[in-house]
Amino acid sequence: MAEAEVKAQPEGDAAPQSKALLFNKWDVSEVKVTDPSLVRYVNLTPQIIPHSCGKFSRQEFNKANMMIVERLINRLMQTENNTGKKQLAIGIVRDAFELINKKTKRNPIEVLVEAIGNTGPREETVRLKYGGINVPKSVDTAPLRRVDSAIGFIAEAVWKSSRKSKKPASAILADELIAASKGDAKCYSVGKKEEKERIAKSAR
């Protein structure tokens, strides 16, 4: 009886592992965070479906370890009508990414990262109490809060525009991210950032 021949594969010729593409389409490894202060807080861990089952919610500030796309999805759920509807929010972001790629021919994750960098305020105001009088004081914004504020402004823009427009939420989100990535002051999120910084500048 002839023995089956088994050829050992050379160590250097190992089969390459397939990358985890977001929504089986977008390569996260192509994206670079250009703002040095945000590198630590914009998480780009490759995932197919951005869903962590709440494992980052048990410890304070642990959300910095959550993929940035999932943080946007979670923020879109924080309305009275969309609470808990993660499948709906994932669908909105997935469709928005398709539209961004169709309009710009770019990786939509890269557009999202640029939009966050352009919409996160670098300074804001706090209220200090002196002898019973509240006095506004300008302070630098922490990098994690910059990311939080940016995602919040983008999500807020989608909520407000969806009430006034017949366009689907995915199209509104796509337009907002494209405009924010270019730093367009006419878009809601960039306008909110500039308003925060203008108030902080007057309180220096």
From Swiss-Prot:
SUPFAM superfamilies registered for this protein in UniProt: Ribosomal protein S7 (SSF47973)
Cystine pairs annotated here are: none
GO annotation terms (biological process): translation
Report one GO cellular component. small ribosomal subunit
Q: Which GO terms describe its molecular function?
A: rRNA binding; structural constituent of ribosome
For the keyword Ribonucleoprotein, the answer is yes
Q: Which keywords appear in this protein's UniProt record, sorted alphabetically?
A: Ribonucleoprotein, Ribosomal protein, RNA-binding, rRNA-binding
Matching InterPro entries: Ribosomal_uS7, Ribosomal_uS7_arc, Ribosomal_uS7_CS, Ribosomal_uS7_dom, Ribosomal_uS7_dom_sf, Ribosomal_uS7_euk/arc
* Highest taxon of source: Archaea
Pfam families given in the database record: Ribosomal_S7 (PF00177)
**Binding partners and assembly:** Part of the 30S ribosomal subunit.
Q: What does this protein do?
A: One of the primary rRNA binding proteins, it binds directly to 16S rRNA where it nucleates assembly of the head domain of the 30S subunit. Is located at the subunit interface close to the decoding center.
PANTHER family from the UniProt entry: RIBOSOMAL PROTEIN S7
The similarity comment for this entry is: Belongs to the universal ribosomal protein uS7 family.
Q: What protein name applies here?
A: Small ribosomal subunit protein uS7
This chain's source organism reads Methanoregula boonei (strain DSM 21154 / JCM 14090 / 6A8)
Gene that specifies this protein: rps7
